[in-house]
Amino acid sequence: MLLGVITLFPDMFQSIVRYGIVGRAIRRGILSIKLWNPRLFTYDRHHSVDARPYGGGPGMLMMIEPLRNAINQAKDELGNNIKVIYLSPQGRKLKQKYVYKLAYDHQKLILVCGRYQGIDERLIQTEIDEEWSIGDYILSGGELAAMVLIDTISRVLPGVLGNQDSKESDSFSKERLDCPHYTRPETFDGMKVPSVLLSGNHDEIHRWKQKQALGRTWIKRPDLLNYIQLTNEEKNLLSEFKNEYLLSLNKKTRK
């Protein structure tokens, strides 16, 4: 997969391309990332990339020409069939199912990172195919959002993760949270690993993990359950979890 990034701060991406999952994807030849700085596509002596907004208002806006020139250069180098994405708080909120779609439906993406108060609306109208947001909060620029998108796309590309099951069991991979996980030591400060995980009974372990994942979703992100079509078995597991959870709460209040 080819990813192009339009950014005023290309050095910010040096760590993500060298380490972790993204670095592994690049070393294995599964992912390639190229960076273009709009400042290199300016023609005035100050290399201006921002200006005051018409109509007044606080802050500065990124100018259309340097951005468009950088995008055009990226398109020339990356080739045809490219989707251009603007990381923006006005964009559609990113979810795991959309990550799969972006990763599997497109071999080439260009990510445009805004700065200041944003970018000239005319660029959005003429050059941007989609706007995506990573959440309802404000960042200083689109670079961190682009890194989030790059990382999450890298995880779902075939051959990147050492264990294919890892991405399938991740939180949100099936529109639900992941189950709790435990490792050594078996007992820590009096807290023990659930006995079922030590039993060796794979069917019971699988059942426990399913129930805990559904229960954790119900407790922490109940909104996600509105989008899940539960099987009868999953409904029973969730009902069991609720009963056990409420029973444990009653015991705590009695103490």
Curated annotation (Swiss-Prot):
InterPro entries assigned to the protein according to its UniProt record, in alphabetical order: Alpha/beta_knot_MTases, tRNA_m1G_MeTrfase_C_sf, tRNA_m1G_MeTrfase_TrmD, tRNA_m1G_MTases_N, tRNA_MeTrfase_TRMD/TRM10
Record bears the keyword Plastid: no
Top-tier EC class: transferase
Subcellular location: Cytoplasm
Catalytic activity: guanosine(37) in tRNA + S-adenosyl-L-methionine = N(1)-methylguanosine(37) in tRNA + S-adenosyl-L-homocysteine + H(+)
GO molecular-function terms, A-Z: tRNA (guanine(37)-N1)-methyltransferase activity
Signal peptide: none
Complex formation: Homodimer.
Family: Belongs to the RNA methyltransferase TrmD family.
Name of this chain's protein: tRNA (guanine-N(1)-)-methyltransferase
Organism annotation: Blochmanniella pennsylvanica (strain BPEN)
